[in-house]
UniProtKB/Swiss-Prot annotation:
Gene that specifies this protein: purL
BP-aspect Gene Ontology terms: 'de novo' IMP biosynthetic process
UniProt-annotated stretches for the region Disordered: 303-327
Localization: Cytoplasm
UniProt entry keywords in alphabetical sequence: ATP-binding, Cytoplasm, Glutamine amidotransferase, Ligase, Magnesium, Metal-binding, Nucleotide-binding, Purine biosynthesis
Gene Ontology cellular component list: cytoplasm
SMART domains per UniProt: GATase_5
SUPFAM superfamilies assigned: Class I glutamine amidotransferase-like (SSF52317), FGAM synthase PurL, linker domain (SSF109736), PurM C-terminal domain-like (SSF56042), PurM N-terminal domain-like (SSF55326), PurS-like (SSF82697)
Name of the protein in question: Phosphoribosylformylglycinamidine synthase
Species: Pseudomonas savastanoi pv. phaseolicola (strain 1448A / Race 6)
HAMAP family found in the cross-reference section: PurL_1 (MF_00419)
Length: 1298
């Protein structure tokens, strides 16, 4: 084993933060140093050349001075017997670089902690430094040799029910955490007595997972008695009623990993499977919809819990039909009170929590990072979501109890696209190969399905922790590339059947696959790819290692499938074959036995149906009179409540421009304020149709009136999605996610009544279907606190997500008030019809109250009329701005519109209030509704349209936006409230800022927060030195000659399709080229005029961002010769964007004229930054930027490592004077800046892009390929038609080739 010291592992910011955390745990800690440690398992002595290559491979990341360490060593390594995702990628890179003597490279972190401490304190330090699920801590480097030793496989065990009877099974139930019900134990004893043998532990675990509440939805399929009355339908039956009443537009419901609805026709853009040339195929592009929850793992370990939640939902989309493509995501969180240190709010009363779960604040620091990181690395934009906190002590008929979300809601959802011919699963023929695609088995996530089905606190802490999975998004990306290549083959798609591997691992996925295909299966356990050979059969079969799919591929299609996997470097294995007989057999060649041999009907068949007999409880509530409150204090409290406050800290960490198909993200207007009502994507690059999604949830209302909370969730979804341009209300389809503390007094009846209100009443009345959903029935946390039994129970929680095809993505409305449209009015549409019900409002919550009467949807006809009028007014161009009314009420809706428009408000409440005592209720009630901005001369027409639709009593003019910073509210000329817009916006932004400050570099958070005080910020602007609508490539395109450009990607790259689309539009033939094609000699770069290295996360950024990719080219002789020859050709050009920029900067020794280039390292904020930034094009030789010098315009940013690091100040100066700086970040006034967030990565002198001395090679961190169409821009000037400013760059390349 070789031991190689690495670079320091912590930036100054992370170092001081960790040191502070350690001192809080162990006050004797006085100092800390951390560096990476690398360990290489070699089968022979390396030559000096090989050693040099290895040394260069392991030199990556920013340049930080190396120290001579002192203090006690805590060496944190991957758990022995495991292979980390880092190791598998680094080992791949080493092999690609010709280091064939290296079996494996592994990495740890050597923490040196100074101070005098006891062994108990040392243990506390060790606990703080590692994740015990995947890591261990050693005291010296030599012990790391055990990383490369392999444990012997553990044997099978049986449970002796033939001899020990029921007691033996009950004991196994507890020890294995199976969560079997009494009737299931009876069923298993009967079944195995019938088979005449004892069950193996692997069979019991498989049964427990397949039949857990998580997988089987027993409560939703149960029969019910309520108050002694038998109920006609199950919960699922009432949901299905929406489909039975209105099935039009639904292509697949209730039977696959996601639902499918009818989409628009467009030119779907992808590479031809044979020629690899990108092109558009005109066809229907149908819409997938799916929303999942991952609540239990997120409570235990928020980052991996939320990451694997997002990953699992992405796999559900990809595994729909015969393979599909995820497109855009959403994330939601509900937690208990945050109690931010130094920022605790008056309504946040400490109650405590069990040791095994983390705090609400830690969930909201780590969980969103996990969800965002997975989406970012996979390459899916996260475009909408929600965030709510709720925790309150309430009085019930059974006494006082705390209701809240110690068990959080972590929602991961999204939409995708699928070909019409692939919507339905195919046939599994007898003998079909049964394949696992993706990563290896590891001992993580064991028993997750059963664990998530228990109330938090009823299982052991070890079982809880074991049930959390760990993520590897780059592997999932490779799997998706394989699925993409398969569906792109059309009727030659080799996949006949596909499922994702989720709860229960292969023990659930393979039986489900063969059972759904009306087959049985024979499997060989040792064919499962396995990175922990010491696992027992149960562990191999049931672990929930992520990023895996199971597929059935016909024998005749197998070679085609294999070739695709090899090109994409995606692991796969044939584990079994399909049989005609419905028997499940798993053999084990190592031990020569059969761990599983049972009929599928025993596993999945006749399990007893649950029956629930429950009673309704009296509704609860308390008195709340808002008229007695001080309005100014109410405004401050409401603006700081997390459900109302800015969600910026959740949004800027998530890529919102990847795919180049995003038409509306959360950030609105020139000042990029996070207030959008819905998310909108384009169907493809050649049309203006698209897809919309929006969310609705009003969970605290359920404590007062559960059915009302369900109706309001649907109502809010509709008032949100109404901002997009949809042909008719029935085009909207809903996902319903139900969370309940089943068994808690009154909660079961509330659940039943709410499902009935939604499924049997409101949705049928609206003509809307719920074709997909999910339930989580164990939303309660119990623990003992110094002998006192405590619990926190969530309210019944329905989270609704709406999806719909969009007629015109250019007509999406936003809350940005327009000050350039003359005199305008603000009109309130109050669907509560003046009732102003305050129950469970944010204002009530900020005073520790609930109130008594909840807002509700009283008449479905009002909602239908509202939707129709808004759509009509939008189509006619009358609505300038739109925002729904929700949390915080009318006051918050109008303030958010003013924040987005950077303007003041003059509101007068004369038309909506009768007396002063009503004003607080009018400003803060959360009845359904919206505020629209219209030109004053159109106001009578607009009001008339609402009157004609029966909504005359719902509408009133409430004021005007004004062109200054003042916000004033009056009633009959008397002032009610006044304030400054920017100070109110700071209050609204402060909760987000406080969390950002704890999570990221505090200096950057301070700069962003202080920027809100700037009075004359003009926002994003455009100043071009060219005509955006001129196509300078048109003469060359007319010749019919289309030069070839290699669209280059490596494993983990995810931005190739939009890059190809930009070059295709500019008149090039874009060809898909994988690095594996170059390394194998399948592609010759001499065939191309241009090459573009695309964005993403090559090798998951292992060995540095873009560095592993670059080194696999530098140290592989075939690849090095190919790249060097290409760069030296005078007729070639190259572009590198984001990850491609990082990669090319590390190839500078091969690129003539690039000696001034920097190295790109971690952003100054220490965070992934997804923003719209202003850049100015510099005077340079870049062939891409000719005729653009001096132009200033916005561009999409999405990177974690974009900080340009030069060797020293002299090198920076040389770059400056050499004329090779191509782009600089500027502030909204046009000045070059290093200030955050205008400069999102802190690069010196605003450097954002470089070129070579002759201009043929250009690299940049921003993403022009995502914003070449006008509709792709989060904000754009109105005079942009089809093209955006960045299209000129690609056309410049086409003109240069000529």
């Amino acid at each position: 084993m070789l031991i190689l010291r690495g670079a320091p592992a912590l930036s100054a910011f992370r170092h001081s933060k960790l040191l502070e955390q350690l001192k809080q745990k162990v006050s004797a800690v006085s100092g800390l140093y951390a560096e990476f440690a690398h360990f290489a398992d070699v089968n022979d002595v390396l030559t000096s050349e090989e050693q040099q290559v290895l040394d260069r491979l392991l030199k990556y990341g920013p340049s930080v001075p190396v120290q001579e360490p002192s203090g006690r060593l805590f060496l944190v390594l991957p758990r022995f017997g495991t292979i980390s995702p880092w190791s598998s990628k680094a080992s791949d890179i080493a092999r690609n670089c010709g280091l064939t003597k290296i079996q494996r490279i592994e990495r740890g972190i050597a923490f040196y902690v100074e101070g005098q401490f006891s062994e108990a304190q040392a243990q506390a330090i060790a606990d703080s430094l590692h994740d015990r699920m995947t890591q261990l801590v050693l005291g010296d480097h030599e012990q790391a040799a055990s990383l490369f030793s392999h444990a012997q496989p553990k044997p099978l065990t049986a449970v002796d029910i033939l001899g020990g009877g029921r007691a033996a099974l009950e004991k196994a139930n507890v020890e294995l955490g199976l969560a079997l019900a009494e009737d299931e134990i009876d069923y298993l004893i009967t079944s195995f007595n019938g088979l005449g043998r004892n069950p193996h532990d692997i069979e019991l675990m498989m049964f427990a997972q397949a039949n857990s509440e998580h997988c089987r939805h027993k409560i939703f399929n149960a029969s019910w008695d309520i108050d002694g009355q038998s109920q006609e339908k199950s919960l699922f039956g009432m949901i299905k009623n929406t489909y039975q009443m209105h099935s039009e537009g639904v292509l697949s419901a209730y039977k696959d990993n996601a639902s499918v609805i009818v989409g628009n026709v467009a030119g779907r853009f992808f590479p031809d499977p044979e020629t690899r040339q990108y092109g558009a195929v005109q066809e229907p592009v149908h819409i997938l919809m799916k929303v999942e929850t991952h609540n239990h793992p997120t409570a235990i370990a928020p980052f991996p819990g939320a990451a694997t939640g997002s990953g699992g939902e992405i796999r559900d989309e990809g595994a729909t039909g015969r393979g599909a493509k995820p497109k855009a995501g959403l994330t939601g969180f509900t937690v208990s009170n945050l109690q931010i240190p130094g920022f605790v709010q008056p309504w946040e009363v400490p109650y405590g929590k069990p040791e095994r779960i983390v705090t609400a604040l830690d969930i909201m620091i780590e969980g969103p990072l996990g969800g965002a990181a997975f989406n970012n690395e996979f390459g899916r934009p996260a475009l909408t979501g929600y965030f709510r906190t709720f925790e309150q002590s309430i009085t019930t008929p059974h006494g006082d109890e705390v209701r809240g979300y110690h068990k959080p809601i972590m929602l991961a959802g999204g939409m995708g696209n699928i070909r019409e011919d692939h919507v339905q699963k195919g046939e599994i023929t007898v003998g079909s190969k049964l394949i696992v695609l993706g990563g290896p088995a590891m001992l993580i996530g064991l028993g997750g399905g059963a664990a998530s089905s228990m109330a938090t606190g009823t299982s052991s802490a070890d079982l809880d922790f074991a049930s959390v999975q760990r993520e590897n998004p780059e592997m999932e990306r490779r799997c998706q590339e394989v699925i993409d290549r398969c569906w792109q083959l059309g009727d030659r798609n080799p996949i006949s059947f596909i499922h994702d591997v989720g709860a229960g691992g292969l023990s659930n996925a393979f039986p489900e696959l063969v059972n759904d295909g009306d087959r049985g299966g024979r499997f060989e356990l040792r064919n499962v790819p396995n990175d922990e050979p010491g696992m027992a059969p149960l562990e191999i079969w049931s672990n929930e290692s992520q990023e895996r799919y199971v597929l059935a591929v016909g024998v005749e299609d197998f070679d085609r499938f294999k070739a695709i996997c090899e090109r994409e470097r995606c692991p796969f294995a044939v584990v079994g074959e399909a049989t005609a007989e419905p028997q499940l057999t798993v053999t084990d060649s190592h031990f020569g036995n059969s761990p599983v041999d049972m009929p599928l009907e025993v596993l999945l068949g006749k399990v007893p149906r649950m029956h629930r007999s429950v009673e309704r409880e009296a509704e609860i509530g308390d008195d709340f009179d808002p008229s007695t409150l001080d309005i100014e204090e109410s405004v401050q409290r409401v603006l700081r409540h997390p459900a109302v406050a800015s969600k910026s800290f959740l949004i800027t960490i998530g890529d919102r421009s990847i795919t180049g198909l995003v038409a509306r993200d959360q950030m609105v207007g020139p000042w990029q304020v996070p207030v959008a009502d819905c998310a909108v994507t384009a169907t493809s690059f050649d049309v203006n149709t698209g897809e919309a999604m929006a969310m609705g949830e009003r969970t605290p209302l359920a404590l007062l009136d559960a059915p009302a909370s369900g109706r309001m969730a649907i109502g809010e979804t509709l008032t949100n999605i109404a901002a997009s341009c949809i042909e008719k209300l029935s085009d909207i389809k809903l996902s319903a996610n139900w969370m309940s503390a089943a068994g808690h007094p009154g909660e079961d009846a509330r659940l039943y009544d709410t499902v009935k209100a939604v499924g049997m009443e409101l949705c049928p009345e609206l003509g809307i279907t719920i074709p997909v959903g999910k339930d989580s029935m164990s939303m309660k946390t119990r623990w003992s606190d110094e002998g006192t039994e405590k619990s926190v129970t969530s309210p019944l929680s329905l989270i609704v997500t709406g999806f719909a095809p969009v007629v015109d993505i250019r007509q999406t409305l936003t809350p940005e008030l327009r000050m350039d449209k003359g005199i305008t009015d603000l009109i309130l549409i109050d669907l509560g019809r003046g009732q102003n019900r305050m129950g469970a409002s944010i204002l009530a919550q900020t005073h520790g109250k609930l109130g008594r009467v909840a807002p509700d949807v009283d008449d479905a006809e009002d909602l239908k009329a509202f939707f129709a009028v808004i759509q009509g007014l939008n189509s006619d161009g009358h609505i300038l701005s739109y925002h729904d009314r929700s949390d915080g009420g009318l006051l918050v809706s109008t303030l958010e519109m003013a924040f987005a428009g950077h303007c003041g408000l003059n509101l007068h409440l004369d038309g909506v209030a009768d007396n002063v005592s009503e004003l607080s209720a009018i400003l803060f009630n959360e009845e359904l509704g919206a505020v629209i901005q219209v030109r004053q001369d159109a106001t009578p027409l607009v009001l008339a349209q609402f009157s004609a639709a029966g909504l005359e009593d719902c509408v009133a003019v409430i004021g005007q936006p004004i062109n200054n910073d003042e916000v004033s509210i009056s009633f009959h000329g008397e002032p009610v409230f006044s304030g400054q817009r920017r100070l109110l916006q700071r209050q609204w932004a402060e909760t987000s800022y406080q969390i950002q400050r704890l999570r990221d570099n505090a200096e950057c958070a301070d700069q962003e927060f202080d920027a809100l005080l700037e009075e004359d910020n003009p926002g994003l602007t455009v100043k071009l030195g060219f005509d955006v609508n001129e196509d300078i490539a048109a003469p060359y395109i007319k010749t019919g000659v289309r030069p070839q450009v290699a669209v280059l990607r490596e494993q983990g790259v995810n931005g190739q399709v939009e890059m190809a689309a930009a070059f295709d539009r500019a008149g090039f033939n874009a060809i898909d080229v994988h690095m594996s094609d170059i390394l194998a000699g399948r592609v010759d770069l001499n065939d191309f005029k241009g090459m573009v290295a695309c964005g993403g996360f090559s090798y998951g950024d292992v060995l540095g961002a873009g560095e592993g990719w670059a080194k696999s080219a530098l140290f592989n002789s075939r690849a090095r010769d190919a790249f060097q020859g290409f760069f030296e050709r005078a007729d070639s050009f190259t572009l590198g964007v984001c990850n491609g920029c990082q990669m090319l900067s590390n190839l500078h020794e091969l690129i003539p004229g690039s000696e001034f280039w920097p190295h790109f390292v971690r952003n100054r904020s220490e965070q992934f930054e997804a923003r719209v930034a202003m850049v100015q094009v510099q005077e340079s030789a870049s062939i891409f930027l000719q005729g653009m010098a001096g132009s200033r315009m916005p561009i999409a940013i999405a990177h974690g490592e974009g900080h340009a690091e030069f060797r020293n100040d002299d090198a920076l100066l040389e770059a400056d004077v050499s004329g090779t700086v191509a782009l600089r970040f500027v502030d909204n006034h046009g000045k070059v800046t290093e200030t955050y967030p205008a400069n999102p990565n802190g690069s010196p002198r605003g450097i954002g892009g470089m070129t070579t001395l002759d201009g043929r090679v250009t690299i940049m961190m921003p993403h022009p390929e995502r914003v070449f169409r006008a509709v792709q821009n989060s904000w754009r000037p109105e005079d942009w038609n089809e093209d955006a400013a960045w299209m000129r760059m690609f056309r410049n390349a086409r003109a240069w080739v000529n």
